């Protein structure tokens, strides 16, 4: 059985959903060729530490992005078909977006699953802003798009189960009822709120503004701290095997920046800006690239917060996180080409948490992690389009050109495929979160629309200022 989105898998024979993304990451050991420095921050609880020096730039600067008309046509296709997923694979009654769906459908919502994801819905709300701006949904008017956003926000505010404003990760797409085994998720609520705020700023509609503001201001961020120095990853209801807050914390640098900044910027339930320094920030050196990175996190951890928060020209006491993600992407490309030269080339590289022939895995590097087998995950390159546009676009265009007959469908790329295996393997599904990061970063590298829209809300900029960005 293929494991679905974001580290969750169905427990064999139980019908329950189990979280294994972070468990998988924690179990992966460091490989040779990487040097991990001591954590920077106060993640262990209040130590005084010295911020790292700014990473040394590589010898070759990042190139200027001057896309050709063919490049723009490709990006249009990637964005338009990705946006179509968030229109067709969402319930018109609840607005929830399916976590995953087959990539060979003809316009109907996938009948084989009812699993919606609040993270996919957050990406979807943002994708609808892009779709409206570019006129991508030829079968939907602006009025219809606004109505869908209103429906989505209203249903989440008034009909979805929540705990102090935090939502269950996976819910029934038709009813909103939490799926058995699902957790109340801190980070996935953050992705939903990013989409909520993006929609509030973009549509400038009184109903959307009211609903979005109520949703964001209802989240009781301090509650998810559970008295600790960092956020708990989840809370489980009394029906779970281990009810209450999870012992796992968002205490080390990863995709967590959006979570902390949304909490710091909250006008109703803020956390103190001092929690920003409680995050441990280990540094990794690989082949001359030095950057902040956990010892076991895939490439998406350097991408997702950047889809909404604009870190390009701002640094805090530790680093410029946009530059940090450039180095992380360069290191990942180098890792693929140097470690597996028989599989990966300059036009075929990029792995991050995804489905694969054996189910689901959180894989990547450096350091090497997971059962790397020559599979490529298109959203790894797509999610880094804003960081290395030329290199990533080369990969994406080649993937479509060379393997598009099976790797590209109604909504763009399938989640992953392996052109090196015998027989070749192609996933038949696409995942909402992976299409989402691809669409958002493609638009950001072209126009910066998501950045400028999201950052026009007062809360993100205020949070960054409070956290010490300048």
Feature annotation, model-predicted:
Residues 1-40:
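N-terminal secretory signal peptides
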Residues 43-49:
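Bacterial lipoprotein signal-peptidase II cleavage site
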Residues 49-59:
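Intrinsically disordered, low-complexity proline-rich regions
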Residues 60-470:
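Ser/Thr/Asn(+Pro)-rich, low-complexity disordered segments
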């Amino acid at each position: 059985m293929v494991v679905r989105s974001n580290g969750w898998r169905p427990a064999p024979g139980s019908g329950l959903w189990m979280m294994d993304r972070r468990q998988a990451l924690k179990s992966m050991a460091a490989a040779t060729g990487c040097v991990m420095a001591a954590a920077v921050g106060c993640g262990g609880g209040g130590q005084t530490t010295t911020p790292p020096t700014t990473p040394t730039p590589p010898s070759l600067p990042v190139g200027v992005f001057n896309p050709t008309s063919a490049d723009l046509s490709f990006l249009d296709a990637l964005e338009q078909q990705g946006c179509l997923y968030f229109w067709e694979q969402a319930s018109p009654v609840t607005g929830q977006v399916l976590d995953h769906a087959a990539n060979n459908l003809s316009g109907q919502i996938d009948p084989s699953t009812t699993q919606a994801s609040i993270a996919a819905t957050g990406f979807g709300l943002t994708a609808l802003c892009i779709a409206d701006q570019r006129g991508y949904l030829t079968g939907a008017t602006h009025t219809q798009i606004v109505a869908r956003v209103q429906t989505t926000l209203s249903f989440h505010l008034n009909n979805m189960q929540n705990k102090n404003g935090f939502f269950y990760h996976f819910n029934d797409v038709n009813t909103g009822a939490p799926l058995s085994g699902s957790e109340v998720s801190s980070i996935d609520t953050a992705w939903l709120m990013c989409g909520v705020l993006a929609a509030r700023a973009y549509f400038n509609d009184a109903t959307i503004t009211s609903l979005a503001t109520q949703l964001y201001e209802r989240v009781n961020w301090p509650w998810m701290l559970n008295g600790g120095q960092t956020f708990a990853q989840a809370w489980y209801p009394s029906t779970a095997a281990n009810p209450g807050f999870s012992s796992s914390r968002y205490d080390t640098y990863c995709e967590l920046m959006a979570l902390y900044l949304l909490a710091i910027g909250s006008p109703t339930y803020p956390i103190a800006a001092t929690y920003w320094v409680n995050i441990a920030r280990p540094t990794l050196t690989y082949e001359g690239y030095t950057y902040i990175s956990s010892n076991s996190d895939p490439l998406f951890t350097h991408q997702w917060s950047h889809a909404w928060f604009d870190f390009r020209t701002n640094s805090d006491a530790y680093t410029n996180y946009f530059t940090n993600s450039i180095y992380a992407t360069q290191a990942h490309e180098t890792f693929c080409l140097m470690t597996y030269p028989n599989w990966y080339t300059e036009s075929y590289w990029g792995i991050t948490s995804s489905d694969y022939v054996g189910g689901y895995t959180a894989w990547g590097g450096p350091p090497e992690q997971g059962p790397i087998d020559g599979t490529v995950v298109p959203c790894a390159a797509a999610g880094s389009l804003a960081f290395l546009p030329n290199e990533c676009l080369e990969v994406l265009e080649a993937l479509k050109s060379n393997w598009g007959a099976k790797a590209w469908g109604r909504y763009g790329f399938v989640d992953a495929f392996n052109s090196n295996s015998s027989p070749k393997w192609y996933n038949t599904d696409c995942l909402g979160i992976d299409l989402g990061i691809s669409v958002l970063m493609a638009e950001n590298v072209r126009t910066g629309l998501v950045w400028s829209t999201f950052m026009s809300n007062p809360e993100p900029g205020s949070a960054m200022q409070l956290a010490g960005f300048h």
